[in-house]
């Protein structure tokens, strides 16, 4: 696992083997960020990373110039690893919270340019993520929600669904806040 772009490009991440995670593969992450390069400007954006695990995605956004990256995971071991890694590489824009993601979303009052969610594949509440994010008005106008999930799972029922990209057994489903971007 490595950072593929930005100021920390090439940095190898070596999380402890006992973390309860399934990190996004380098191949899938590189494909995701290539898609995003054509859609958003990373410099200065505000990102919410749900089920952040090792922080692989959070650190990638921070490396590429995100102004603020909020990472949420319920594992104290993942939270501690990401806090330590962020501190070690002076990524002050990464803020890490130990919390159940669904509880966090119910309390969240901020809005983001991008929300990324990589829940455990066996989580039966994955289809609820877009519903909650949009009900809570967590995305800025024009902003994206990206949910990583098993390719065999379909979560395209939400009206804000834009597209799904498959990478082997993993897929990214994209949702866009279609609210007036001029507001």
Where are the language model's segments positioned?
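Class I S-adenosyl-L-methionine-dependent methyltransferase catalytic core
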Residues: 1-183
